[in-house]
Structure formats: C-alpha cells, structure tokens
Amino acid sequence: MNPGYFITGTDTHVGKTWASIALMQYFKRQAKVVVGMKPVAAGCMLSDSYEGGGQYLCNEDALLMQTHASLHQSYDLINPYAYELPVSPHIAGVDDPVDFAKILECFDALKASADIVIVEGAGGWHAPLNAQQDIGDLAKALDLPVILVVGIKLGCINHAKLTYQAIQQSGLACAGWIAVCVAGDMLNKDENIQTLKAALSAPLLGVLPHTLTADFDLLAEQLVINQ
C-alpha cells in the first residue's frame, strides 16, 4: 500500500483542500488510519489557542486537515511552515526559508502513526517554495504518487495538460486526477471533463460537484481509488 499521496493542482484555488479532505474521508471509510499534511502555507492567521500555550500562526486548510484526521496530531507536524503574508512562500518565507529536511522529518513522524498521509501542496506544480526549489521538487523529495486536482473552469484543459506533462517528466507516478467543479456556471462542463479524460492517461478518480458548503462525506462518495 502507498504510504500516502501528494496532492497538487492546476493552480491555486482549484479545490485542492476539499479534494484532500474528501480523500481522507474516503480512506477512513476503508478502515485506514489517515492523517493530513500541508507542509507550507501562506496567508496564515494568528491564533491564541496554541497547544503548548501562547500564540501561533495557523492556516485554515491545515486546521481542517487536523480536524478530519483519524487521530490527533500536533499542528507543527501538519503545517511546519506557516507564513503570515498572503504571497508566494519563497517571498513570504525570505527570513525563514523552507527547508525540505524539516518537512521530511515531520512527514516521517506522521507516517509512523498512520496508514496513509495525504500531503497537500501549495499552489501549482512549479510554485516556488524557496530560492531553489518548488512544489514539484517537494513531491520528489517525499517520493509519493501524485494526484492532480483540476479546477473545472475556462482554461482548465491547457492547465491540466501542462501540469500532467510536468508530473510525468518528474518521474513520479500520477495515481489519477480529480475534477473539482469550481465554477457553478461553467458552460459545457461535461464536455470539458470528457476532453480531459481523453487527454490524460491517468484515471479520473472522481468529479466533485460545485457547492458553497463542504460536505466531505458526500464528496468522498464521489471518489473511487484503486490502490
């Protein structure tokens, strides 16, 4: 069994977090112990409820992953790099740059207590994390199969084909892709999804419907993953 999956997307705001938590719920239904990880996040909020006392920066998506895990994990393991500025991590973290060694240490700690770790990347495949490395480099360092989240909107076919090509060039396996209907008024949505099915050789794992309120159990029902 795979120790986890790396979740990337065609862009930012394409539904990676909802897809990630839907995957967590899906595997929990398979009686797996599942935890989530968002190694790098920007635009974080200051919280007064740090587990060890005092204030800390936290990310809403990472908190959702913490809440929906099979067992409680320290926030520091789930989101080791939390930046306040809502900009690219390589800019937000100029004074505290992302170090892959720290992320790998946190991942190993999570993996030791779970069957599956769902790791959500920031932004798209080539989003920079520090001066030299990007999301694709992190996926390679973790050596996890990749699941591509495609936000179904105008331009998604081009974005999906380019991202899928980059994943293939990295040498990592693409376990499949998830369509997320981010635009409620998308014209010819089904035709776009069929075009993507023909263009991407990886399997379609599910289509998540457009919704303003997340029902992660319902979203999990839309997924089928063959491990």
Name these PLM-found stretches.
Residues 8, 38, 120, 178:
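Short beta-strand segments
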Residues 1-6, 33:
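Extreme N-terminal starter segment of soluble prokaryotic enzymes
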Residues 13, 122-202, 206:
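Conserved catalytic-core segment of NTP-binding enzymes
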Residues 193-207, 211-226:
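C-terminal binding/interaction regions
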Residues 18-97, 108-109:
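N-terminal phosphate/diphosphate-binding loop that engages ATP/GTP or pyrophosphate donors
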Residues 6-20:
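Glycine-rich phosphate-binding P-loop
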Residues 14-18, 56, 60, 82, ...:
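Conserved active-site and cofactor/substrate-binding residues in soluble primary-metabolism enzymes
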Residues 86-129, 136:
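Phosphate-binding/switch loop-helix module in NTP-utilizing enzymes
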